[in-house]
Regions:
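Sec-dependent N-terminal signal peptides
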Residues: 2-12
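Extracellular/lumen-exposed scaffold segments
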Residues: 15-177
């Protein structure tokens, strides 16, 4: 019986399951939580959960803002979300992100798009080893404060991939320069 429970516990944290979460804390409150996994479809999926009142920004936020500014100087710029994949994974396709919310304040020449509550990001990947790291840089904000995010997630690729992530078809490719 003990062996059965140990095997089941091991399956619960397998490569098909989510990585250990990276929690971003501001004033004793977890404002953002990131997790990652690789699915059977060969996608690296990164899930973001935000606390009420917090939001973060699109991967292509700067490109979108520059388009709206049309050469004018911005009075403020929110930091885009970015991921750096290293170790036993290589990105083999465009990054995808969900539909965006518009946080822009055109009267102040501030243009920004992003996410509230939850967001998933995905990219097709190739396995090249048994462990990988996903570096995360972003910014999470409320109406009054912002927190720079610089964290990482570790993935054990020696374990089986999980089922294809539902909802990937709703994601769209990020804009490129």
């Amino acid at each position: 019986m003990k062996l059965f429970l140990l095997v089941m516990a091991g399956l619960a944290v397998s490569g098909g399951e989510w990585s250990k979460p990276a929690e971003i804390v501001v004033d004793d409150t977890v404002c953002a939580t990131y997790r990652a996994r690789v699915d059977d479809g060969g996608h690296l999926v990164i899930a973001l959960t935000l606390a009420d009142g917090w939001h973060t920004f699109a991967m292509d936020n700067q490109i979108r803002a520059n388009e709206k500014l049309a050469g004018k100087k911005a009075l403020g710029m929110d930091k885009p979300t970015s991921f750096v994949v290293s170790g036993g994974l290589t990105v083999d396709g465009p990054w995808m992100q969900p539909a965006l919310l518009d946080f822009s304040k055109p009267e102040l020449r501030i243009f920004s798009w992003g996410f509230e509550k939850q967001a998933s990001f995905a990219a097709k990947v190739k396995r090249t080893g048994t462990a990988a790291r996903v570096g995360i840089r972003a910014q999470a904000c409320t109406e009054t404060i912002c927190k720079d995010i610089n964290t990482s997630l570790d993935l054990d690729l020696a374990l089986a991939a999980g089922p294809v992530e539902p909802g990937l078809s709703a994601l769209t490719p990020i804009r490129a320069q």
